[in-house]
Amino acid sequence: MKVLFVTIFIVIADQISKFMIKGIDIPFLGISFQGMPLGNSIPVFGDFLRITFIENPGMAFGIEVVDGKIFLTMFSIAASIGILFYLYLMRSEKLLFRLSLALILGGAIGNLIDRVFYGVIYGESSLFHGKVVDFIDADFFNIDFLGFQLSRFWVFNIADASVSIGVLLMLFFHRSFVDQKELPAIESKSSTEVNTSI
């Protein structure tokens, strides 16, 4: 499944970007990078786009969960395995559909690595208790809907963006996915009806 190269690329890009933000020190490989102080923010395009280093123990886009850290991590593992298996089952489907799954899988694995290993790698907590590194701070639009207000979008990372793009691809092109599967059945039914009438 060549589409898995997209998944691998997303995971690598996501982890490299997080190491550059948080910093990494691997003496035996001669790798040492300081990173940014937690909470620091650097403007890229004025106030519209900033690099803001935050960590969260919860879900995507800096959304925290009060309890159930282990449950969330285990659910992420199960979901990643499920998506990979589903992608294998759908290996003969339309490329765009498989691409959307590959993007979602890459993002899921990227954040899963943070949750499973970062606590141990950085000496901050035990296995499965790591925090997700977020840093893309963009002011896309304000939200004011049914009492919910958001003046600035949640801080996110490459993995979050990959999952979101994959889901949007599925939503936007869902009709074409369904039509492609239904077309052979419709053609077969029409052919049968024609033969019967003859």
Predicted features by range, described:
Residues 1-198:
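Alpha-helical transmembrane bundles and membrane-interface segments of multipass inner-membrane proteins
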